[in-house]
Amino acid sequence: MKVIDIYNSLKDSGKKGFSIEILPPVKGTSLDDIEKSLLPIIPLNPQFINITFHAPVRKFINENNVTTLVESHPRTATAAVAGALKRRTGIEVVPHLASAYYTKLQLEDFVIDFSYE
């Protein structure tokens, strides 16, 4: 079900709903801890899980008197995490990203990556 359908269903029924927001795991860590933290919440029937895709961390590195701007992403695999959580929990997942930090082409790549259904 799409999020707009969830909103419309709640609106039409007059019911209230809620969502959960999580961060993807830090590079090199497992999704298991996130899943464990969601276990007590899933029976409460959240309408969707929102996964934050953060802006890159930018820092200057000076090597051999040459300064270079380097971008890194301490939290990666947002699309993979979104797909895995949706399959494992059955709850709709909404990945979102801070688009102000990316080019149009990078955003296009992210949208393609987020097409996990």
What are these regions, as identified by a protein language model?
Residues M1-I6, T29-I34, P40, V57-K59:
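N-terminal glycine-rich phosphate/pyrophosphate-binding loops that anchor nucleotide-derived ligands
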Residues K2, E63-P95:
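Alpha-helix-loop-beta-strand connector modules within alpha/beta enzyme cores
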Residues M1-I20, K27, K86:
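N-terminal amphipathic alpha-helix/helix-capping segment at the start of soluble metabolic enzymes
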Residues N8-S13, L38-N45, A80-G90, V111-E117:
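Acidic (Asp/Glu)-rich catalytic clusters
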Residues P25-G28, L44-T78:
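Glycine-rich, proline-tolerant flexible connector loops at the mouths of alpha/beta enzymes
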Residues K16-P24, Q47-I51, V93-L97:
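Hydrophobic faces of well-ordered beta-strands that scaffold small-molecule active sites
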Residues T29-E35, S99-Y116:
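Glycine-rich anion/phosphate-binding loops
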